[in-house]
Amino acid sequence: SINATDVKTNDAVTIKLTMDCFRSNGVTSGMVSLGGNVQTIGTKPDGSLWKVAIQNPTAEEDADFLGILETKDCAVITSGGYERYFEENGVRYHHIMDPATGKPAESDLTSVTIVSENGTLADGLSTALFVMGLDKAIAYWQAHASEFDAVLCTEDETLYVTEGIQDAFSANYPCEIIQQKGAES
């Protein structure tokens, strides 16, 4: 049997294999986008940074997005319960499972975007931080800030952006910068 988690993992693996093929064949500029998974190599051919829009999980139209991230040489991977779900008796059940309960995760986050040079890490963390919820996700980033950055979106469309990408991210909604532990406010 195949479930949504298997498909998502296959998206990340497909992108990794594609990027490995590009690199082994000398490609120095490119972008692959598959679902909520985006991976870039280098900059655009003109030398400018790639622009990756992060979808608004509560938007009724696809054209609405949380913001734009300018980037190069990294993965930008988003998880949220807004695309793969079903409704029964007025209750929405999404595909991101809480391993502690075996049920859809109850989270105060509507989406988690991870930015990392390691696409496999970003794929796993986008789901894990969604399950953790805002406070634990922030604490996790603060303990592992050298490995990834993040854009966390709450139900009220407040964005929490890690300081490592604050200058590269143009937000369309209220935004708070998450700083590393011990950093001055």
Predicted regions and their residues:
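Mature catalytic core of soluble alpha/beta enzymes
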Residues: 1-185
